[in-house]
Amino acid sequence: MQLVVCGVLGLVLGLYAFTLPECPLSQSNDKRNLAQRLGLDAFVLFKSKTMAMFFIFSMLLGVSLQITNGFATPYIESFSAVSDSWFANNPTMLVSLSQISEALCILLTSFFLIRFGIKKVMLIAMFAWVLRFGFFGVGDTETIWGIAALILSCIVYGVAFDFFNVSGAMFVQQEAPQSMQGSAQGLFMLMTNGIGASVGTYIAGKVVDHFCTWEAGHLVSRAEFANGWQSTWFIFAGYALVVAVMFMILFRYKHDRSKMENMTH
């Protein structure tokens, strides 16, 4: 049923797109070379220490993003194997909380970015990742506190995702030259959803395979289930905490509130 609803909504949105006003591409007389056409010119941004550090930590945060993309839903769904509670048998509800939180928190990103600057906003996102993984580590579907931890983890996901992805894209738009805006955004996506996601998939997979042996059909007790996932999520939380502390120490940027307020996006 869910796939049918998604298909119908996709068709409706596709038809709606035909009613939108035409937005012709701007005509430029500049002749771009092959490197510019491929977006490779954005790599010159690494000459700036601030931008280089930003992109490196974007990659490290991309690892956290891939961890939750790859294993948050399987983790929540796996409770049904060891629990008969309502939450264990309705994992979609918990997963949907993350999506709702993401949709609501996106409204806050501009305000926080203008008021506090990219460093503080990204630090908020990083510590939100720590809480996201930490709450998963102590969560369960049998106790009130465990259920509350799972709910809080799903709620804090909106902050973790939006305060990094959305504010990061806005920061790149602010700092990159006008001539390479598109290339710079592509580089940001490469570092997060490309390199970061690939590294995150590999490392997270190794950690889960090591601690969650029942994934291969060897689950023997509820305790093994809990201990395996708990160790896994605490390792991920520790990783996110180390990244946050390193970012706090290494990233240097003086926030210009007026510059951010005047930015068009």
Regions found by a protein language model. Give the residues of each.
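Intracellular juxtamembrane helix-capping segments at the cytosolic ends
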Residues: 163-177
